[in-house]
Amino acid sequence: MDMLNGGLAGKLILFSIPLAFSSILQQLFNSADVAVVGRFAGDQALAAVGSCVALVGIFVNLIVGLAVGPNAALANLIGQKNRGKINSMVHTILTFGAVLGIALFVIGMLVARLVLVASGTPETVLDQALLYIRIYFVGIPFMVAYNFGSAIVRSYGDTRRPMYYLIVSGVLNVILNLLLVIGFHLGVAGVAIATVISNVVSTFLIISHLYRRNDEFSFRFDRMRIDTNELKKVLAIGIPAGIQGAIFSVSNVFIQSGINMFGESAIAGSSLALNFEYFTYDIAGAFAQAAVTFTSQNFGAGNMKRCKKIFWLCLLFGFGFTEILSVIFIVWEDFFVSIYTTSAAVAAYGIIRMDRVCALEGLTATYEVASSCLRGTGKSLEPSVITILGTVVFRLIWLTTIFRMFTTYDMLMNVYVASWLFTGCSMFVVYFFHMRKMDKLFAAR
């Protein structure tokens, strides 16, 4: 895909649709985990999996955030037409990914019990939650490899291939869920095992694709090494984005502690409602991914006017399409919630969360697109700091002040939209100041 010339709107949509579909598809498969557990293993098992959501989110968001680095760094080299360094960058990315994956696996195993206990996971579900999360962490190295491999593929405009690989691994995940949970009665362990196997398959497919290539994007095991200069470029963007993602999830651990105060029904209801938030957020996230890739290439080519147009189009599409799906979920929320549970108490908590959070998920596009455009120009620290202030510090202040004064489930849920508004407005200010500075810099050349 030529990101440097021609119309933008159509290309942004064509680039983003497979990304959004891939993420939604992945979430559908994750939702199948929740639905199978809730329907065939019981509310206690569902609460056990739900108790792990925040901890899983820390690692997943860290990995996804770090993967922004490879995507932006490679796209920038493509924009500069610097083909000589691309293959070195590819091998640096995947070698670093292998080391990182093993390190995260070890860390996850060590902190699992500590985090679950600290977040107030009920004793009745703690053992099941610990079993689930420890099996889940076995798949972390493969998750890193897949995300880094996909970042390489997306950098040159191919978003369809990762989607096809997710379809294959996701269908396998659902089949294994049904087999292991219903057929072999393995409960939460069965769901975790199915997830690990699907991660292995998706990783095999993406690495095999890169191995079959014979151009600058090809991968060979005997060339695995780290070029420190290339790694610095990746980490300069990836580390702030990764830390942002991880710390963002830390705030959700504190929110999860608040949810745990309301009992197993609240935990299970919040867990099922979270699936719909992921579906809607995936659309905003897809256009944010498009923003960082398109901006990186055009910034590398020195086209600031096109970079600004990318921002406005991604913001419009990200907010608009996200809200369309949100409205669909809210209008038919009773039906959607009934897919996951037959418990009236669990459903009631799920619907409250959907009405308070999912209904305005489009607001996430404001800070996601702006931060992605900033990273596309090499500015990664500032958006990370703003996101941490808006989604961690702001939420902690809310939890320790407003929520303490009005200790209700509804008030706890209100923290999400309030923090999105604060973060989005702050990110806009930084974006416009930065772009004005870039205009002056390029005009002086």
Name the predicted role of every residue range:
Residues M1-S16, L74-P141, G183-I239, T295-L360, ...:
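Short alpha-helical transmembrane segments in multi-pass integral membrane proteins
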Residues N5, A9-L28, A32, L55-L62, ...:
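Residue-level signal for short hydrophobic patches within transmembrane helices
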Residues L14-D33, I135, Y146, S169, ...:
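Transmembrane helical elements of multi-pass membrane transporters/channels
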Residues L28-A47, L116-E123, L179-L186, A246-A273, ...:
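Helix-terminus/linker motif at the lipid-water interface of multi-pass membrane proteins
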Residues A41-A54, A129, I133, A192, ...:
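Small-residue hotspots at the loop-to-helix junctions and early N-terminal turns
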Residues L46-V106, M143-P162, G269-E333, T364-T387:
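Small-residue-rich hydrophobic transmembrane alpha-helices
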Residues I58-N61, N173-N177, T203-I207, F279-D282, ...:
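Hydrophobic transmembrane alpha-helices of multi-pass small-molecule transporters
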Residues A67, Y136-R154, P162-N173, V191-I206, ...:
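Short runs within selected transmembrane alpha-helices of multi-pass transporters and secretion channels
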